[in-house]
A protein has these predicted regions:
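Intrinsically disordered, low-complexity regulatory regions
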Residues: 1-122
């Protein structure tokens, strides 16, 4: 049986040599769907659909902000350790701006923190 990480369907935008793939990071830390989709689009934007992917990321951040604000939620992202995010960003060749976006999305504590993510994308 082959390893799912060795198989890439539809391009190489997630294929990482020796590093952690996006789905591994999300699954390992039980990251929510909206945060996961956001980080997926930020990770791949330069190698797949460009600005369209950044707009998709923005859309997911907006939805997350709206849902959490409406709920007066104290729920937060599972707080992925910065070291893990750094390793992921390095393996996936993310630049400083992409690293900052992914880090903020994976460590937010209150809905107002998501506004900073949206400001960075504007």
């Amino acid at each position: 049986m082959s390893n799912a990480n060795e198989k890439q369907v539809g391009g190489n935008h997630y294929k990482v040599s020796g590093g952690r793939q996006h789905w591994d990071l999300i699954d390992d830390f039980n990251v929510g769907y909206l945060e996961g989709c956001f980080t997926k689009y930020v990770t791949r934007w330069m190698s797949k659909d460009g600005l369209k992917d950044l707009r998709k990321a923005e859309h997911f951040a907006q939805k997350l902000y709206e849902k959490r604000s409406a709920m007066n939620s104290v729920e937060r992202c599972p707080n992925v350790p910065t070291f893990e995010i750094f390793q992921y960003a390095s393996a996936n060749r993310l630049g400083p701006a992409e690293f900052q976006l992914v880090e903020k999305m994976l460590t937010w504590k209150q809905p107002s923190d998501l506004l900073e993510v949206l400001r960075l994308l504007a």
